[in-house]
Amino acid sequence: MQKDSGPLMPLHYFGFGYAALVATGGIIGYAKAGSVPSLAAGLFFGGLAGLGAYQLSQDPRNVWVFLATSGTLAGIMGMRFYNSGKFMPAGLIAGASLLMVAKVGISLLSSPHP
């Protein structure tokens, strides 16, 4: 007989999609321009975002890795977008990061505290 471990939390699909977008951006930057720093940063931040999304799917209050990752990327890529004026890739990642910060922040503020 299998023991019931309670309800499972749903996967954080938006978070995993965001992590895939960030990692894919790094891979594309490497493929198009041969930029090793772009590859390293994309895989690093994509991995952190994936870890944060996994943590969110396990406990919706465990937002700190995901929030720090998306907030850092919003700041870095927002400055790159401001300085270059190019939407791809800096504007896209900055916008997606801001949306993720807003989504997680709103869900954190609106959830009941134990």
UniProtKB/Swiss-Prot annotation:
One of its GO terms (biological process) is heme biosynthetic process. This is Transmembrane protein 14C. One of its GO terms (cellular component) is mitochondrion. Keywords: Heme biosynthesis, Membrane, Mitochondrion, Transmembrane, Transmembrane helix. It is a multi-pass membrane protein. The keyword Transcription regulation does not apply. InterPro entries: TMEM14 (IPR005349), TMEM14_sf (IPR044890). It is found in: Mitochondrion membrane. The chain crosses the membrane at residues 8-28, 33-53, 63-83, 89-109. Required for normal heme biosynthesis. Belongs to the TMEM14 family. It comes from Mus musculus (Mouse).
